Amino acid sequence: MARTSFQGEIPKEQIGVCPVTDAQNVIAGKWKIIILWHLKETKRFGELQRLVPGISKGILTSQLRELEKDQMVIREVYPEVPPKVEYSLTEAGKGFMPILESMGEWGKKYAINSKKSY
């Protein structure tokens, strides 16, 4: 079965039905989890793009906008020339970090069982 990626608004009837579904709707997408992981510390756009190999500028922009809309990320623009924009986690984003850390630990255990190494 082919994998698909959700694009667009989440149907209203799916919101609030299951807290796991609600969480999944926020972090769904190929890149969001790794973007959140790298935002443990405040980063500029170019730094994020370097840290996430294979992501295009447009996709990174769109994923950051979605994370900002879902109140996981704050975009701060400084009135400087050249323009300076930084991204950081909101309290909700910071609250997700223990889950990401647990996922990382699970990934390490899975890698050992699968004979992979990091």
Give names to the regions the model predicted:
Residues A2-G8, I15, W37, K94-Y118:
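Amphipathic alpha-helical dimerization/coiled-coil segments
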Residues R75:
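Short beta-strand "wing" residues that participate in macromolecule-binding interfaces
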Residues Q71:
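Glycine-centered, phosphate/nucleic-acid-interacting loop/turn motifs that mediate DNA/RNA or nucleotide
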Residues Q63:
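Residues within the DNA-recognition helix of helix-turn-helix
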Residues Q14-I59, P83-E86, S117:
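N-terminal helix-turn-helix DNA-binding core of bacterial DNA-binding proteins
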Residues P79-M103:
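Basic, amphipathic "hinge/linker" alpha-helix immediately C-terminal to the N-terminal HTH DNA-binding motif
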